[in-house]
UniProtKB/Swiss-Prot annotation:
HAMAP family: Salvage_MtnA
Keyword entries, A-Z: Amino-acid biosynthesis, Cytoplasm, Isomerase, Methionine biosynthesis, Nucleus
Protein name, as recorded: Methylthioribose-1-phosphate isomerase
Organism taxonomic ancestry: Eukaryota, Metazoa, Chordata, Craniata, Vertebrata
Enzyme class: isomerase
Active site positions: D246 (proton donor)
Single GO term (MF): S-methyl-5-thioribose-1-phosphate isomerase activity
Amino acid sequence: MSLESVRYSRGSLQVLNQLLLPHKSEYEPVTGVQQGADAIRTMKVRGAPAIAIVGVLSLAVELTTKPCQDVPSLITFVRESLHHLVSARPTAVNMKKAADELNAFLAEEADKPGATSQRLTESVVQWAESLLKKDVEDNQMIGDFGAKHILEKAGPTEKVCMLTHCNTGSLATAGYGTALGVVRSLHALGRLSHVFCTETRPYNQGSRLTAYELVYEKIPATLITDSMASVTMRERKVTAVVVGADRVVANGDTANKIGTYQLAIIAKYHGIPFYVAAPSTSCDLSLPTGGSIVIEERPSHELTDINGIRIAAPGIDVWNPAFDVTPHELITGIITERGVFKPEELKDGLTKGQ
């Protein structure tokens, strides 16, 4: 059984405070939009899919427990709440796409004859709940598509060795995970020999969260420092690198956790395939290249301090971007719930049939 980043029933939302992991597992209530935005901004919950899910569910909870009295006030509240949630962490596109889709859905429902605040509230809540269910289904498909694709490149009985970065598992999504979902699927098939996970400085999502998930599920794994990636790829016969994404744009350029770009360069040098695993909700086809992606910058103390104890020299300047952009030329394939695409095939692959 996978870990849960969120626990939801209608009118009630709890998020696993990931700042306390791996030492303490504690779920905290989210009673409304402001608490949802705070949980996202402070990284109690993180991962592009999970951010969107917590965002829309926090809205659903507040609408359920504190319903609006008329249609105009409901529309205004939803629009302003979604804007606030999007601004909490702007690089991840999932929350922005969910906000745009929900605003459009609500406007369409409000134009129907007989629309009332009660009916519209029910529609919004159901929409938010459907996002939770769909994310788990999409992640399982990503895992299975990715595992199948990687195994097709291997021998018929060969086990594969993977390397991954940051945290892209159940803790970053509604369940199962994206890049870590691929690892899970390989393990379930009995075809995973080992996975290496990077510590992912400065927030240590790899050592705190990914390692926690891998130990929890008894998947054979080894934690490495970020600076060990080169020697690991060379010495440990890594089959492929698989990472997640906070935003993939039309040409395949990918924004992901800081350090992803250098992993792609190292993989290219060693002739190792480099895959991005992401749901279509993380793909922003409105941006032609990664140069337009807004990169969030985090506070300096996240780099200079650990658990409130300063480890860096006082007075040193700090640059702490949360993400970097990997050029599409370094990416072998993008694994989505609709299949695996080369970067240049992504836009057509995701728009076909729409």
